[in-house]
Amino acid sequence: MKMSALFPIFGLPLLFCNSFAAELKATGRGCGGLMDGCDGKSTFCCSGFNCSPTWKWCVYARPGRR
């Protein structure tokens, strides 16, 4: 009984993550979204995001950000 309850709890999120990763790979997006790694030289952030110099990942672009 416990195992049959755990299967949907852990199995379905794994299935969704796997399908999401496959879709991302298929689109071949050339820019990074929120919290994707970037360096500003070879990898860039998409529109609406900036590459954080401290953390080296894409963050939301805010007006007045230094």
Curated annotation (Swiss-Prot):
Query: What InterPro entries would the database entry show?
Result: Huwentoxin-1, Huwentoxin_CS1
One GO cellular component term, please give it: extracellular region
Q: Offer an example of a GO molecular function term for this protein.
A: ion channel inhibitor activity
Tissue expression summary: Expressed by the venom gland.
Q: Which cysteines are joined by disulfide bonds?
A: 31-46, 38-51, 45-58
Where does the protein principally reside? secreted
Query: Where does this protein reside within or beyond the cell?
Result: Secreted
| PROSITE patterns from the UniProt entry | HWTX_1 (PS60021)
List keywords of the entry alphabetically.
Answer: Amidation, Disulfide bond, Ion channel impairing toxin, Knottin, Secreted, Signal, Toxin
Propeptide residue ranges? Answer: 22-29
- Key word Nucleotide-binding present: no
Q: Name one Pfam family in it.
A: Toxin_12
Q: Where is the signal peptide?
A: 1-21
Instruction: Kindly list the positions at which Proline amide occurs in this protein.
Output: 63
Note what the entry says on domains. The presence of a 'disulfide through disulfide knot' structurally defines this protein as a knottin.
Annotated family: Belongs to the neurotoxin 10 (Hwtx-1) family. 46 (Jztx-7/10/12) subfamily.
The UniProt function text for this chain reads: Probable ion channel inhibitor.
- Name of the protein in question: U1-theraphotoxin-Cg1d 2
Source species: Chilobrachys guangxiensis
Q: What is the lineage of its organism?
A: Eukaryota, Metazoa, Ecdysozoa, Arthropoda, Chelicerata
